[in-house]
């Protein structure tokens, strides 16, 4: 259900044009200024939508159709040792099955971008990756922000000392696969395999962008912890066991066992099984607690 006030610039009729083709029985609109009791009207619309959705049946879908977003936040000294390499191993596995993974938070790539450039499938993708990086650097400079204004205080407290160290951890999340696509902010996924997506490092903005691109879930590694979630399952993978123990309501999977003598391969097997369960409907913590938010990357004038 799409709800509008009725006097804003983004009118429902204009919004509909950008949606393209959609099922009129499954997408409904309500303009609150045009109805009497918006609560009752909204509940009636939701009851109608539920009646149709309740007839849906689950069907088997191969892993080749799964699309995941790769993100990190509140990184620490273990990020590049445990959780990020785990995501990289999973990403390579998923892509080998014909699936798709998406890496974003471009400013976090500064200092390790040549690793991604060297893995582009062709010259066109190489040039697009160069533009992806340089475009964000120019954005920083245009606002007087130092390109190297990273790592954050939390990163430093967790043991990360330089931007390059943080960037090397960031790029590990996408494994060793070749880059098959580069997308500007707001674009929907078109290619399978590893895609690079333009978005800032801000957790909620980046996660929203990944979900909007068509990712079914966001895999989020963290060493410091965060409870947030966007409108798709936002799975938190801890880099250390202490965080997983202290924040069971935040963390969904503990990668800290990798430094406690569990082989990476065994951890990845358990991780794959868990992701399949979540893709099949099992809730992660942000869903259980109702943490579902979005944030839009804005620049320029706000009226």
Show where each model-derived region lies.
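Metallocofactor- and cofactor-centric catalytic cores in central/energy metabolism, strongly enriched
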Residues: 1-217, 224-303
